[in-house]
Amino acid sequence: MSLEILDQLEEKIKQAVETIQLLQLEIDELKEKNNQSQQANDALRSENEQLKSEHQNWQERLRSLLGKIDNV
């Protein structure tokens, strides 16, 4: 009887270890996806700042041109 219980316990431990290993793999995959998402986010933020700067420069140039037209 006790041998049967030990076998059951061993099987449950093996299943628990397998589950833990699978969860660790999933965690590693999610960490990698998170890192990739963070890099993409950083790149998009940088691009957004660059585009805002370009937009502001264009607005200033347009204002300057409109000012010159008004002076004519």
Curated annotation (Swiss-Prot):
The GO cellular component terms are:
cytoplasm
Q: Which residues form a coiled coil?
A: 1-72
Recorded hits in Pfam families, A to Z, give: ZapB
Disulfide topology: none
Cite the residue spans of the region called Disordered. 33-57
> What is one process in the GO biological process aspect for this record?
FtsZ-dependent cytokinesis
Report the locations given in the UniProt record. Answer: Cytoplasm
Please give the superkingdom of this protein's source: Bacteria
Keywords attached to this entry: Cell cycle, Cell division, Coiled coil, Cytoplasm, Septation
Q: Do the record's keywords include Coiled coil? A: yes
Its main subcellular localisation, reduced to a broad class, is: cytoplasm
Composition-biased stretches (Basic and acidic residues): 44-57
Q: Identify its protein family.
A: Belongs to the ZapB family.
Q: How does it assemble?
A: Homodimer. The ends of the coiled-coil dimer bind to each other, forming polymers. Interacts with FtsZ.
Function of the protein: Non-essential, abundant cell division factor that is required for proper Z-ring formation. It is recruited early to the divisome by direct interaction with FtsZ, stimulating Z-ring assembly and thereby promoting cell division earlier in the cell cycle. Its recruitment to the Z-ring requires functional FtsA or ZipA.
What protein name applies here?
Cell division protein ZapB
Record the organism: Pasteurella multocida (strain Pm70)
